[in-house]
Structure formats: C-alpha cells, structure tokens
C-alpha cells in the first residue's frame, strides 16, 4: 500500500488542517464544513494526477487544440455522516463521478466498549473501476477495513484511493495488516501518534461528524 502525506509539504493545505484542528475556529460548523470541503478539493487535484489520460483534439472558436483529457470516471465512496463534506470536495472536481455511500457507526456496549456496524450501502458496480473512499478520520482503522470489505461485495475495483485527513499511527498499521484489497493508496493530511482508549486520535480534532452537523444522542 502506497502512503502519500500531503501535510509534509508546505502549502495552503496545511492552513486548512490548522483551522479544522483549532478548538476556537472549529466551533463555526459552516466554516468547519467548508474547510473539510476545501481539503477534499486539494486531495482530488492530487489524486487526479494518478488517473489515465489521452490526448484529444478540441475545437476552439479559432482552431484546434490538442488537450490531455482524463479518460477515467472514478467512483466516489464515503462513510456517513462525517465524510459528507470531504466527499463534496472530491465531487466538486470529479463532477461526473458515480457515488457510493456507506453507513458505519459505533454501537456502544456497557463499559465503554463498542463495535463498528455497517447497516446500509448504496453503490454502483465497482468491477474494473477506480474508487476513491473517504473518511475524515482514520483512528483504529476498523471502520475503513469494514468499508473496504463492503465495497468489494459490489465488484473488484482496479484501484482504491483511501482519503483520510487525520490518521493515527496505529490505524495506518492496522490498515496495512488487514486491508482486504492490496492495490490501494492511502492519502492523508496528518499522522498523529496517540489514540485514547475510546479510539479518538490525539491531538486529532475531536468528533468530525459532530463538528460538521451537530451532536448526536
């Protein structure tokens, strides 16, 4: 699995990472969602460099221009609900893509433990397709592995690009060891070393879904 960390380069990408982490700025849910969307757009631009292209003649008002056009139409997949702003950022650039939505949530048990449950999925056929699977946080890595397994029930993709803004070291290792599909690339914005007993990344940013859409009960 190839790993690409966009946060290792100095760019405005890191400015948006800072804002979604900042405990004061992230209180503005509209700004939080928009920053996640912007981050998704930057990820989409970088991922587009990995797609297939061919030269085509384009007619302009004054002549013919040879342009390099993307010949792939990736399927964009997201884990609800936290992944929606990130998904929208990807969709802003891959605006002809088909879409896939996966419902994954923590089912809490007594004592504070929980298990990840997937109860809903809407997807086109993924046979031979390039898939971009996004979730803003990669903590334990369990939900991402389960989401990938769910995707594979809809066909065998050509390649899966996994997009996670903030990851834990433990989550990356778990994904490496347990991924059900080897032909994949992990794109991330930051890697944090610690994680709480409840699988929240430290320093992380908190609960991305709650910050974007409000607290749940």
Regions found by a protein language model. Name each.
Residues 1-217:
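PRPP-associated nucleotide enzymes
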């Amino acid at each position: 699995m190839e790993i690409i960390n966009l946060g290792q380069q100095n760019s405005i990408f890191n400015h948006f990472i800072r804002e979604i982490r900042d405990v004061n700025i992230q209180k503005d849910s509209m700004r939080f969602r928009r920053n996640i969307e912007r981050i998704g757009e930057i990820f989409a631009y970088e991922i587009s460099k990995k797609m297939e292209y061919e030269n085509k003649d384009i007619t302009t008002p004054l002549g013919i221009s040879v342009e390099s056009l993307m010949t792939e139409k990736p399927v964009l997949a997201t884990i609800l609900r936290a992944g929606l702003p990130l998904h929208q950022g990807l969709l802003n650039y891959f605006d002809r893509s088909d879409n896939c939505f996966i419902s994954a949530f923590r089912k809490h048990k007594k004592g504070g433990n929980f298990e990840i449950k997937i109860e809903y999925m809407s997807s086109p056929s993924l046979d031979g397709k390039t898939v971009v699977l996004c979730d803003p946080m990669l903590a334990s890595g369990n939900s991402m592995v389960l989401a990938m397994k769910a995707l594979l029930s809809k066909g065998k993709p050509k390649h899966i690009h996994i997009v996670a803004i903030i990851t834990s070291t433990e989550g990356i290792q778990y994904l490496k060891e347990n991924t059900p599909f080897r032909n994949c690339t992990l794109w991330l914005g930051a890697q944090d070393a610690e994680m709480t007993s409840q699988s929240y990344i430290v320093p992380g940013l908190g609960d991305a879904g709650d910050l974007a859409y409000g607290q749940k009960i």
